[in-house]
């Protein structure tokens, strides 16, 4: 099946395990967001590289702010509920999961390591030495942060950029990696919460990388695409082109800023504004009829009428500013020209009209990115 979740899960990087009772292979992933905690269990599908979901659990997230654990007890309860529900629906017992990690402390850097060839052909030992030096460079660049993932970007030998340098001749061999860093404190706290919920952390996958693997085809990764994952309190962006990561960034703002704008403009609570946004939100001014009103009733209170024109204008103005910031971010990072397509995902991408707002402000093709399991690569571990 092809399923669109409230948040995109890191399916390509989840862990292969054996069901204790039936001896079947299955996969488990855990995504702990500010708004929701989701746990997915899947099994290899009939087609090579595809997966079939056999169980899912979700819970309202508590104890997490901007992707970071702030209350261990509440976070553990949310994780435990999602994991137990996933185990029940899948009829399996999980011992470990791959966990997506993000938050405002996630950072990235492009790093290079090299080795001198002295005119000789590139050997396997040269490749390993260049890769080792690239890893050391990434650790130095992190300045004390934990390296979450190193993504190989290829090799350069002389004027040639390649994925397979063995046998080439040149003065030196350079290995390029894209490093993603996270807060060691947050990673440790997240691990403890997951363990207290009853499962082990097999490994972490950065949210931006996981989202890109889940929503982009191989063609899109080659031609150039930016994935903007709009969470509740954070937004991540990753640019892939020529099959490589060009840029990654996480900002401490998300879909909640739209909610806060509505609350301030309409003079209502954040809870009421969130409900109003979910039920009647829209970013396209063309969808407003003159004099149209929205009838809103919250928790049994007397219904109230709000101007739909004011509601839509508020959300449209925020969307315009939001995507203007990301356009400028990509320009400043010299990544804008690599992008042919923008893919929106995460809970914030469900706001009606947001894709049109992004296209108008960024000047790129835009689509909403549900997971398509047909192009995912199953893990080998």
Regions found by a protein language model. Name each.
Residues 328-341, 345-346, 368:
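Hydrophobic alpha-helical bundle architecture
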